[in-house]
Amino acid sequence: MLDRWGADALRDSDGTKLDAATKALDAKIYTTYFVARGHNEFAQEHMDECQQMLLMSKHNVATENTVTIDFLDGYYREQVVADYVHDPKKWWEVIDRTTGEVVPVSCWEVDQDKDLVTIKDAVPFHEYTVSFFVYAIWDPTQMYNHITNNWGDKPHDIPFDVRQANSGAFAKDYLKQWLIDNPDTDVVRFTTFFYHFTLVFNDQAKEKFVDWFGYGATVSIKALEEFEQEYGYALRPEDIVDNGYYNST
């Protein structure tokens, strides 16, 4: 087949591996390498270092002075979970979309057991949204391949954030050892690299929104803290979610 197709290289892919006999053929060997996923044993011990995203709830119309928002409604809960490690009152944002005003943190509360935000002193018939941080607990590229190819009970790859101390050190150390352990590899094919393009799924496990040039999957609380430290001003959640447009391009 190599001769008939004129191939000069062989490569694996997400979900496949080349066996030793194949790697010994007279061809260049490309090996897929995942920098920040595919290491669940490490990731499960550092779930507070999962990659993060800022998402926005659906627009919810208040019909009385109190409105409760299921902010994860419409999102795939096998992909994301709300971040309660960090204080929602500091990092989340509730907005009256009718006026564009930010709702004071004193006027809303989070039910962490039910993933709900309740707003008091709401204006009837105004629309409200919640912008909130999540942890990504399933790598979206592997999730797409997993669902499309019906991989069944194959474990879900947990993406970790190399900006974090433990994850960054693990990624460096693992790569050094991997290079030693894979002498037959001619080309390391980095896949996903550190972060994804923006890829978020809905509650039917279908693509909810995709931005091939988006940076939404690079946003984390640590990143925002470091941004403020370097530039002297803080970004708001709205700078990222952009009323649901996610500031694409």
Predicted regions: what they are:
Residues 1-249:
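Glycan-processing catalytic domains of CAZymes
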